[in-house]
Amino acid sequence: MSSTQFNKGPSYGLSAEVKNRLLSKYDPQKEAELRSWIEGLTGLSIGPDFQKGLKDGIILCTLMNKLQPGSVPKINRSMQNWHQLENLSNFIKAMVSYGMNPVDLFEANDLFESGNMTQVQVSLLALAGKAKTKGLQSDVDIGVKYSEKQQRNFDDATMKAGQCVIGLQMGTNKCASQSGMTAYGTRRHLYDPKNHILPPMDHSTISLQMGTNKCASQVGMTAPGTRRHIYDTKLGTDKCDNSSMSLQMGYTQGANQSGQVFGLGRQIYDPKYCPQGPAADGAPAAAGDCPGPGES
């Protein structure tokens, strides 16, 4: 049976876009490194075409027997398609038993039909890294060595002692100290010599937490509770007695009582109601003779 029946026609549309995207991720440099690594371990030549040299599965099964002897008991050297697919299936099963992660594996058709050579390359690189992790020495430095599990067992006493240790997530106390600090609860006098504030001599000293008294003074202030006369010399307010009006009540500079009489009767005279005419004796009429409003 010819292998042409497994070949597919050209891809179009979305299938072609997906195929081109997968091919763009294929690394020719990694292919050359894999070629050197496989040929160095197996002693077999892959040939100019990497996919055609590995599609029969013979070289790959030989590689697994070098990494893990007896992992592939039987290698089919027939050119029949199902024999080649069987070799690829046995190689994939051997990788699983070798400890490969299932997400790093490829399918047989990915290599046989060249459907996804990028995944084939990823699987072989992961296999090289797994072999390096297990201590395989090779002339070609390829693959990433996986970190090994580091497990520690602690007794109960050690676990309880670790509960008193401050974790690094909480910060560090390397640069912290209590130098210069007084004991907790001790009385402290707060002052600052840089601001020329003298050390406190008594309990009436204002601490720095309340501000500073450097520029404050009581010059010109009388003792609390002392009677004070409020006046202003600029406004002409006299300070002779207690009848002086404070500035809060206004000022009397422009006010006076000239022409006012307190306690005496006042004659109300309105020229509109008192006609100016000669009396019988030739004298003006008296103010009391003026008729009131509404009188004739």
From Swiss-Prot:
<feature type="repeat" description="Calponin-like 2">
    <location>
        <begin position="206"/>
        <end position="231"/>
    </location>
</feature>
<comment type="similarity">
    <text>Belongs to the calponin family.</text>
</comment>
<keyword id="KW-0677">Repeat</keyword>
<keyword id="KW-0007">Acetylation</keyword>
<feature type="repeat" description="Calponin-like 3">
    <location>
        <begin position="245"/>
        <end position="269"/>
    </location>
</feature>
<feature type="modified residue" description="N6-acetyllysine">
    <location>
        <position position="25"/>
    </location>
</feature>
<feature type="domain" description="Calponin-homology (CH)">
    <location>
        <begin position="28"/>
        <end position="132"/>
    </location>
</feature>
<dbReference type="GO" id="GO:0051764">
    <property type="term" value="P:actin crosslink formation"/>
</dbReference>
<dbReference type="Pfam" id="PF00307">
    <property type="entry name" value="CH"/>
</dbReference>
<dbReference type="InterPro" id="IPR036872">
    <property type="entry name" value="CH_dom_sf"/>
</dbReference>
<keyword id="KW-0112">Calmodulin-binding</keyword>
<dbReference type="InterPro" id="IPR001997">
    <property type="entry name" value="Calponin/LIMCH1"/>
</dbReference>
<dbReference type="GO" id="GO:0005516">
    <property type="term" value="F:calmodulin binding"/>
</dbReference>
<comment type="function">
    <text>Thin filament-associated protein that is implicated in the regulation and modulation of smooth muscle contraction. It is capable of binding to actin, calmodulin and tropomyosin. The interaction of calponin with actin inhibits the actomyosin Mg-ATPase activity.</text>
</comment>
<dbReference type="InterPro" id="IPR001715">
    <property type="entry name" value="CH_dom"/>
</dbReference>
<dbReference type="GO" id="GO:0051015">
    <property type="term" value="F:actin filament binding"/>
</dbReference>
<feature type="modified residue" description="Phosphoserine">
    <location>
        <position position="138"/>
    </location>
</feature>
<feature type="modified residue" description="N6-acetyllysine">
    <location>
        <position position="8"/>
    </location>
</feature>
<dbReference type="InterPro" id="IPR000557">
    <property type="entry name" value="Calponin_repeat"/>
</dbReference>
<protein>
    <recommendedName>
        <fullName>Calponin-2</fullName>
    </recommendedName>
</protein>
<keyword id="KW-0009">Actin-binding</keyword>
<dbReference type="InterPro" id="IPR050606">
    <property type="entry name" value="Calponin-like"/>
</dbReference>
<feature type="repeat" description="Calponin-like 1">
    <location>
        <begin position="166"/>
        <end position="191"/>
    </location>
</feature>
<dbReference type="InterPro" id="IPR003096">
    <property type="entry name" value="SM22_calponin"/>
</dbReference>
<feature type="region of interest" description="Disordered">
    <location>
        <begin position="275"/>
        <end position="296"/>
    </location>
</feature>
<dbReference type="GO" id="GO:0031032">
    <property type="term" value="P:actomyosin structure organization"/>
</dbReference>
<feature type="modified residue" description="N-acetylserine">
    <location>
        <position position="2"/>
    </location>
</feature>
<dbReference type="Pfam" id="PF00402">
    <property type="entry name" value="Calponin"/>
</dbReference>
<keyword id="KW-0597">Phosphoprotein</keyword>
